[in-house]
Regions:
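Preference for long, well-ordered alpha-helical segments
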Residues: 149-175, 180-182
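Acidic/His metal-coordination segments adjacent to aromatic residues that form catalytic metal sites
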Residues: 103-116
Length: 182
């Protein structure tokens, strides 16, 4: 990790968020003498960033209206494409823990085994990642078969959100060490 979190700064950041449900697990880890995973530790170096992450998470992931399985598919697809070790490995563990797939990497790569809805979402995501200025009307039309306008907005935001987290983790050398393994 390229950023070295300071213990006192971490404790203060998490104490300020002690009542927040999203950080319940992290606060339990701290009480037990354990540390939070590196992404949260890194974000806690700026309490503003940690609060922003919390707000986005509450509304988009794990919050939001899209099915959790679809969210994990989107997260894994972006994370693999962006070579984000933290997000890829942690969401492989999360996907296994939720019982979504025993082989999450195949879950993403074997697209012909996915339903039409998931295939449309991944095609849209791939188009955004390739060049967000060139998403075709055909891709949008295919998406509209399965998603409402509101869901398309949420899906687009989720795609941007996970890409931002991938870039954050990659740039700062944040690594996953199995903290979320089932």
């Amino acid at each position: 990790m390229r950023i070295k979190p300071e213990t006192e700064q971490l404790k203060q950041a998490f104490q300020n968020l002690a009542e927040n449900e999203s950080f319940k697990e992290t606060n339990e880890r701290l009480k037990n003498g354990e540390e939070p995973h590196d992404m949260v530790k890194t974000m806690a170096m700026s309490e503003h960033v940690l609060k922003a992450m919390l707000a986005l998470g509450d509304e988009v992931y794990p919050g939001g209206s899209l099915p959790r399985q679809l969210k994990e598919l989107i997260i894994l697809n972006s994370s693999i494409q962006n070579s984000c070790q933290f997000c890829t490995k942690s969401h492989i563990d999360i996907t296994k823990g939720l019982g979504i797939s025993d082989d999450p990497e195949a879950f993403v790569s074997e697209r012909d085994k996915l339903n039409d809805c998931d295939q449309a979402a991944l095609a849209y995501q791939d188009a955004i990642i390739a060049d967000s200025n060139r998403v075709s009307q055909e891709t949008i039309s295919r998406l509209r078969i399965h998603f409402s306008e509101s869901e398309i907005v949420e899906l687009t935001f989720l795609i941007g959100y996970i890409n931002m987290l991938n870039w954050f983790n990659n740039a700062l050398g944040v690594e996953y060490r199995g903290e979320l393994a089932p």
